[in-house]
C-alpha cells in the first residue's frame, strides 16, 4: 500500500470512528436501542440512510446489547426509479431487507395540481406505509436518517415560518401511537456523512425523481447554516449544544414554566436576571478539535473501514 493509500485509509478510519462515536452517544443518551430490538432502517437510497445502515451494522459487532436490523425501501413507482440498485446492494451486503411497492406517485399526481410541491402529501402517505410495514415485520423501532443539520434546519424553519421553538426529536412516539421512531444520526454532521458516503461509494439514488419543486424555505435555511459554518467556525456546534441546554425559566412560554407562581419571597431560579450577564462568553465559539488544520491524533485508529 502506497503512502497516499495509507493516508487515505487512516483518514477513512478516523471518519468512521467519529461517526460510530456520535451514533453510539446518541443511542446511549436517548436509550434508542435496547436488548432484543428489531430495528427497521428506512432506506431511501440517499447518503444519510446508507450511512445510517452502515454504522448500525458496524456497531452491531461491539454493542453491549443484541439487536437485529432489517432495511426497508419504499418503491413509490416514480418514473425513472432504478429498481435494481437497492436489491443488488443489499443482497451483496448480506442484510435482511424488504422492498415495499406502492404507487404513491400516482396518487400524489392525481391529487396535487401540476407545479405545486407534493412533499407534504407524499410524506404522509409514505409514513403510513412505513408504519404498516414495521408492524408486519415485527419491528420494535423505526430508524430514520436525519442528522444534526436536519435538526437545526427544522428548528430555524419553525422559528422563522411557524412561530415555534421546535426542532426534530432524536426519539419519539409515531403519529399512530404504536411505534417508536429513532434518529441515531442526531449527533452526526452532514459534512461527515457526505465524506463517508463518497469514501464508501454508496450507489446514491437521486431524490428529485418525482419532479416536485424543492422546499425553498428549507433550502434557504440550509444555505444560511452552511454560510455560518464557513464564516464562523464552531457556531453550528454551539447552536446544537443550545438545543440540549434549554432554560425554560428564561423563555416566555407560560405552559412550559409557571411564571404566575413567582411572588415576593420566591427563590431565585437559574440565576435570575443575572444568569446571562454573569457569563463570560468566548469571543469565538469553540471549534471541534478534529477540525483544526494541524490536529494530530495521539494514537492510530485501528478500526478498519470495510
UniProtKB/Swiss-Prot annotation:
The lineage of its organism: Bacteria, Pseudomonadati, Pseudomonadota, Gammaproteobacteria, Enterobacterales. Catalyzes the ATP-dependent 2-thiolation of cytidine in position 32 of tRNA, to form 2-thiocytidine (s(2)C32). The sulfur atoms are provided by the cysteine/cysteine desulfurase (IscS) system. GO terms for molecular function: 4 iron, 4 sulfur cluster binding; ATP binding; magnesium ion binding; sulfurtransferase activity; tRNA binding. Coiled coil: none annotated. Pfam families: ATP_bind_3. A motif (PP-loop motif) lies at residues 44-49. This is tRNA-cytidine(32) 2-sulfurtransferase. The gene is ttcA. It is an enzyme of class 2 (transferase). It comes from the Bacteria. CDD domains: TtcA-like (cd24138).
Amino acid at each position: 500500500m502506497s503512502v497516499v493509500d495509507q493516508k487515505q485509509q487512516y483518514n477513512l478510519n478516523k471518519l468512521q470512528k467519529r461517526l460510530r462515536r456520535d451514533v453510539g452517544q446518541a443511542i446511549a443518551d436517548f436509550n434508542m436501542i435496547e436488548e432484543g430490538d428489531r430495528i427497521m432502517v428506512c432506506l431511501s437510497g440517499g447518503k444519510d440512510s446508507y450511512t445510517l445502515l452502515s454504522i448500525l451494522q458496524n456497531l452491531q459487532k461491539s454493542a453491549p446489547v443484541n439487536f437485529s436490523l432489517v432495511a426497508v425501501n419504499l418503491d413509490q413507482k416514480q418514473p425513472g426509479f432504478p429498481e435494481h440498485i437497492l436489491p443488488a446492494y443489499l443482497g451483496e451486503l448480506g442484510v435482511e431487507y424488504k422492498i415495499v411497492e406502492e404507487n404513491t406517485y400516482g396518487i400524489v399526481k392525481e391529487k396535487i395540481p401540476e407545479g405545486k410541491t407534493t412533499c407534504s402529501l407524499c410524506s404522509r402517505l409514505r409514513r403510513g406505509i412505513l408504519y404498516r410495514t414495521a408492524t408486519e415485520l415485527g419491528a420494535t423501532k423505526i430508524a430514520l436518517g436525519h442528522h444534526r443539520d436536519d435538526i437545526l434546519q427544522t428548528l430555524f424553519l419553525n422559528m422563522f415560518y411557524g412561530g415555534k421553538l421546535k426542532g426534530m426529536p432524536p426519539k419519539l412516539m409515531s403519529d399512530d401511537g404504536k411505534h417508536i421512531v429513532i434518529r441515531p444520526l442526531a449527533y452526526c454532521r452532514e459534512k461527515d456523512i457526505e465524506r463517508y458516503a463518497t469514501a464508501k461509494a454508496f450507489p446514491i439514488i437521486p431524490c428529485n425523481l418525482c419532479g416536485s419543486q424543492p422546499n425553498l424555505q428549507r433550502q434557504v435555511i440550509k444555505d444560511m447554516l452552511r454560510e455560518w459554518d464557513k464564516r464562523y467556525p464552531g457556531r453550528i456546534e454551539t447552536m446544537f449544544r443550545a438545543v440540549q441546554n434549554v432554560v425554560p425559566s428564561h423563555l416566555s412560554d407560560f405552559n412550559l414554566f409557571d411564571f404566575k407562581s413567582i411572588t415576593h419571597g420566591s427563590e431565585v431560579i437559574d440565576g435570575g436576571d443575572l444568569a446571562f450577564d454573569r457569563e463570560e462568553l468566548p469571543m469565538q465559539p469553540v471549534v471541534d478539535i478534529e477540525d483544526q488544520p494541524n490536529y494530530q491524533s495521539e494514537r492510530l485508529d485501528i478500526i478498519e473501514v470495510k
